[in-house]
Structure formats: structure tokens, C-alpha cells
Amino acid sequence: MDYKKKENYKPETLILSYGYVPEWSEYALKPPIYQTSTFVFKSAKDGKKFFELAYGLREKEPSEQIGLIYSRLNNPNLEILEDRLTLYDEAEDCAVFSSGMSAISTTILTFLKPGDKIVYSTPLYGGTYYLFEHFLKSMDIKVLKFYLHENEDNVINLILREKPKIIYIETPTNPTLQMIDIEKFSKISKEINSILIVDNTFLGPIYQKPLKFGADIVIYSATKYICGHSDVVAGAVVGYKNYINEIKKTRTFLGTITDPINAWLLLRSLETLKIRFEKQTENAIKIAHFLKEHKNVKKVYYPLFSEGKQYEIYKKQCLGPGAMISFDINGNEETAFKFLDNLKVFKIAVSLGGTESLAEHPWSMTHSDIENSEKLKIGITESMIRLSIGIEDVQDLINDLKQALDKI
């Protein structure tokens, strides 16, 4: 198979070999780890040409290959990983980062300058909220948000009136798992020439493909499902080449690229991404149904249980409900903590998407930097628990949840 030839192969086939030729590395079946800080040029002229491209001093010629210079700019492991990360999303290009937050911050800083505007949906990940509400505001960037329970016409009018440079949405939302219509916001963004950015961490790249619905840029915390083993912190951005090229220039000077070892580990993880995520989702569906029937559970937040317009959006743009579940128990923070402390199989930890099942308390953990009044406004309560479902035996997981719920 040609290392960049896709033919009619599915992503599950391409993900094993795309972007790499064994002849490059003594016929090694898998890419080695290119643990080097710098690369040798064949000639001084090559060095000059490579830097011209790296620093955007000229456009790449059609048949020209971008050469290797220094691992802050590019590295073989990263280039192979970036090639493969385009497959599931059918993206033109990809940039990989040292964390999900570095992917978000580098992308935002690429396109916003003092005086610009950004509109974002809420709720969303607590770290992103802090970046927008504190860091961006300190740079004299106008930050506006909208709530999913707001009147739709009011939201549209806000965006059309303010004409933000960026519209940023996270769907499903973290931790309330509400759906946002990507296609609708794409139409609005194109009308005012905004950039639509979608955080697709909870469902992607298997169960939701935002580029197909008009997103310009898709962001991942690759730490989560893409890695799937809770042993790498990384981020990724996929999308159209014109946007990714600009993001890569910013990444070069901010130094937010990931390292060769993490890239190699992510290449390993990509090979099992789909089968892991399918098993996690299969488990999650059964667990969500169990929770819905338990007397000590007040409400379950899961895309499969969406109603009305929310369910319509889910059916239109999602290929499955994923493996994240949130629920409100009957009680308060003390009750929630008692439940968490009685878990045996589930681990009390933040993050998500790994092979092991995790449970956390958004009010006091992942979203603790959000004001309490704001948390209540966006649907985060003291009694909310967020679960990341792993690949364990599903009955063991259900039994664990049952015994902990029965003790509150």
C-alpha cells in the first residue's frame, strides 16, 4: 500500500499503516521512536528551503516535501500520527499538541487578537471556561456566551449582531451531555464569516464527525478516547489545510507540540480506538438503563435518553451515544461523596476515555473553578456524578454502582 494512498480502504484498515513505509526504518513493521531533537540536512540549500516553508516565507510547491528540521517544528512520529488522525474525520490536515488545553489555546490564539470577539456555548470543560473567561478577557478579547436553554432566536441574533471571529461549541456538553446542532451553527458562521470550532472529545472521532456538518476546525483532548490507556497527555486539531497551516505556525513559536514518545504511544492507541470505543459504548448503554431504574437516581444524562429537539439533533449528527454518563443522585454533595467513596471497581478520578471506569464529582472537581451560581444555571448540581465507562465486565460495573447507590 502506498504510504499516502487511501484508495477505497476504510479508516480501520488505513489506521494500521497509513503514512509509513517499513523501508524507511530497516523494514521495521512499526515506526520506531525518533527520539532526536534535530535533523541533518543533506545540503545547506536544503536547510534554507526547509526553513522558508517552516516559517511561512513562501508557499510549498505542488510536488515539494516538507523537510525535517527540529522536533519543536516536526518529527517523523508526529507526522505519521497527524496523517492517521485525519482518517476518521476525513480531514485535510491535523496538528498534534502536548495536551488538549494546549490544542485549544494555540488554536484560539492563532485566530484572535485584542479587540476580536468569541462566542461560546455553555456548559463546557472547566479548563476551557477559565481560558475564555479569564485569560482571553485579560487580553482585551470580548468573550460572549450563550446557554442552551436560551431562546434560539436570541442566540442567533446575538451571533449575527456581534459577528464574532470564532464560534466555539462543545457537543455533547461536559458534563450535562446536551446536544448542539453543528449544522445550524455552521450556516450562521458562514453567513458572518466566522470560524466554527467544535470540541469533539466526548464522541469523536468514531461517533460524531463535525466536519461533515460544516465545522471548520475540530478539537480533541487526545488524552481521552484517542489514547484510551490513561498514560498520555496530548491534544489534536483536525480540519481544513488553510486553518491547520496557520495553527502549526503558532504551535512552532509557542512550543506546544507533543514529543516523539507520546506520538508513538498514540499511534499504538489509534489501532484499537474503534473496538475500544465500541465496547465502552456497549457497556455504557446497559449502565445508563440500569441507572435510570434505580430508586436513588433522580436523573440520567445520556444522549440516548435525549427528548424532543435534543433527540432529533442526536439522531441527525451522531452515530452512537458514546461512553460518558452523568446522573443526579437523591441528595447533596455529602451524599455524592458517600456514593463515590463506596465504589470499588470504579476509580475516583478525573479525565475520561480510558479502558478503566472512572467516577468524579463535577461540582467540586472538573468544574470547581466555575462560580456556584453559574454552575446551577448551566445544570451542574451538587448531587451530579460523571462516569467514564471502561471495558470491564459490564455486570461487575453495574454491581459496583448498585452496591454504592444502595448505601446512600
Across the structure, where does each feature detected by a protein language model lie?
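Conserved C-terminal alpha-helix-loop-beta "cap" of PLP-dependent enzymes
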Residues: K299-I385, I389
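N-terminal glycine-rich, Lys/His-bearing helix-loop that initiates the first secondary-structure elements
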Residues: M1-E61
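Conserved PLP-enzyme active-site core in the AAT-like
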Residues: D2-K6, S17-W24, D93-N296, Y301
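A common structural junction motif
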Residues: G255, L343-S351, A404-I408
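PLP-dependent enzyme catalytic core of the Aspartate aminotransferase-like
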Residues: M1-Y3, Y9, E92, E133-H134, ...
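Acidic-histidine catalytic/liganding microenvironments
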Residues: Y88, L291-K295, L343
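Conserved N-terminal alpha-helix of the aminotransferase class I/II PLP-enzyme fold
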Residues: S43-S102, G127, F132-H134
